[in-house]
């Protein structure tokens, strides 16, 4: 009886973080509150273990990491065009994302998971034009 109780308690403890994981929906839009070609919301404050679901509300969009804007050890990602994509937050830090065909039009987003441990690396990435203009206010929302 006692070993079964210990095993059940350990299983409950190991599964507990998954039970508290949260999902955030981010729409990929042709037109939104911030103008044309946007993610809404463009800034997400998540935790390790949470998921972010990018919803292809308007077709012709995808989601891809911005080179140099992922925490150490996190694998690069790129979704198929016009399909929803679920990103599981695997590590603490900042995740810069873009819509590949609309990147130059400023279709960017930022996810913060826990402490911004890779903030310096994200700041070192050179964005241009509308992508830079839209990304700067997102960086200003980072919580230390």
Per-region residue spans from a language model:
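Bacterial N-terminal signal peptides that target proteins for export
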Residues: 1-7
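N-terminal signal peptide c-region/cleavage motif recognized by signal peptidases
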Residues: 16-18
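Extracytoplasmic copper-binding redox domains, predominantly the cupredoxin/blue-copper superfamily
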Residues: 20-144
């Amino acid at each position: 009886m006692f070993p079964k109780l210990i095993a059940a308690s350990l299983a409950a403890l190991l599964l507990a973080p998954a039970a508290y994981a949260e999902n955030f929906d981010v729409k990929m839009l042709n037109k939104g509150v911030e103008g044309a070609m946007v993610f809404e919301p463009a800034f997400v404050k998540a935790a390790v273990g949470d998921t972010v679901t990018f919803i292809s509300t308007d077709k012709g969009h995808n989601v891809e990491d911005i080179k140099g804007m992922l925490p150490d050890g996190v694998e690069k990602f790129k979704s198929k065009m016009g399909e929803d994509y679920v990103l599981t937050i695997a590590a603490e830090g900042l995740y810069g994302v873009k819509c590949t065909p609309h990147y130059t039009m400023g279709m960017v987003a930022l996810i913060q998971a826990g402490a911004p441990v890779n903030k310096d690396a994200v700041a070192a990435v050179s964005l241009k034009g509308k992508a830079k203009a839209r990304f700067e206010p997102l960086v200003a929302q980072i919580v230390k």
